[in-house]
């Protein structure tokens, strides 16, 4: 089976994906130099990554957004260096993590989108240095996953979506 190309360039993230998808050969390639997308929706951001990356194999990319339950994006507020970003108001505000994976099974094939949603809250402080992205900031509710299957203790909030 040829390797599936993960368009990201983050080897720690690739290790997480290899753990979630054992047995699937995975190659990691960085996003193109200068790549940028201003798409507000994670589905379009993930699709843009796949469309912008010239690969001669099946490939996928992911995009994540974190919102309040009424849809207000927390991405910019929590991604900043603002020291108040973990204030009590944020910690007590219910949040929803959206993950979209854009998959192109072969060169020229249509792009498929798989979406996962998990409800929870913002962490009191970021998790340690070996936890990536939103997993550092988001604490899932015990029954917060809106996808197939249950995630294990070692699996990130996005493991359900990737496994689909």
Residue ranges and their predicted role:
Residues 2-5, 11-164:
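Anionic-ligand binding patches
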